[in-house]
A protein has these predicted regions:
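Sec-dependent signal peptide recognition
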Residues: 4-14
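Acidic, polar-rich low-complexity tracts and alpha-helical solenoid repeat scaffolds
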Residues: 3-6, 21-219
Length: 219
């Protein structure tokens, strides 16, 4: 029994050592091992933190039916700066895990990212910063996905989150421009289409263009 335990621990330590030392090796085994470690260890734990933080925000939000309901339940604290430290330990955990995934498991070989989970890490990084109301750093993370991973399966989600962040920064005209361009793409899925129109409606309302807002909300 003890021999089997020792063998298992030895194999696990050896595998961990290989993963830790392999970010520049251009082989399928190393791509697979880094992607696996990123997804099922680091990003999983970060995702749990992110989900818990979002649940806490929703639990602490109360609808005022005498006021226009926002697209997203999140109370904005006006005196925060873009460099403020995270307020939530859940979002701090998510940001730390995303950063760890990027720093330890990114496999940029020949100018191309070989770890298929790194775009997910940047998306989590941006979301954690967004919910912590550090919108400028969040925008940096979303823009990085659009610049570095144009063929990512998460590209539409990243575009939606970029515009959510732009709206929080008061860039409503830019949101309308970018979302209108996004909606020209006939390949967008129903949820992306719905999120995009909700953002358009909110941005038009922020600019006090009520007729345009109503038209988009009806979509």
């Amino acid at each position: 029994m003890k021999i089997n335990i020792i063998k298992s621990l030895s194999f696990l330590l050896f595998f961990t050592f290989l993963v830790a030392c392999s970010t520049k090796k251009d082989t399928f085994f190393f791509f697979f091992s880094h992607a696996l470690s990123t997804k099922y260890n680091i990003l999983y734990n970060g995702g749990v933190g992110l989900d818990n933080g979002v649940k806490a925000i929703k639990a602490n939000s109360h609808d005022d039916f005498w006021q226009l309901l926002p697209v997203e339940k999140m109370q904005i604290i006006e005196d925060l700066t873009s460099t403020s430290k995270p307020k939530s330990t859940d979002f701090e955990l998510a940001e730390a895990k995303a950063t760890k995934a990027i720093q330890k498991h990114s496999m940029n070989i020949g100018g191309r990212e070989k770890n298929s989970q790194i775009d997910e890490a940047y998306l989590m990084l941006g979301k954690a910063r967004y919910y912590d109301q550090r919108f400028v750093p969040a925008l940096d993370a979303f823009n990085y996905i659009l610049y570095k991973y144009p063929n990512s399966s998460k590209i539409y989600e990243a575009k939606i989150w970029r515009e959510k962040t732009n709206m929080r920064l008061g860039n409503d005209a830019l949101v309308i421009k970018n979302i209108s361009k996004l909606l020209e793409d006939r390949e967008v899925k129903k949820q992306v289409f719905a999120d995009a129109n909700a953002l358009l409606g909110a941005s038009f309302l922020n600019l006090e263009e009520k007729d345009s807002a109503v038209a988009k909300i009806k979509n």
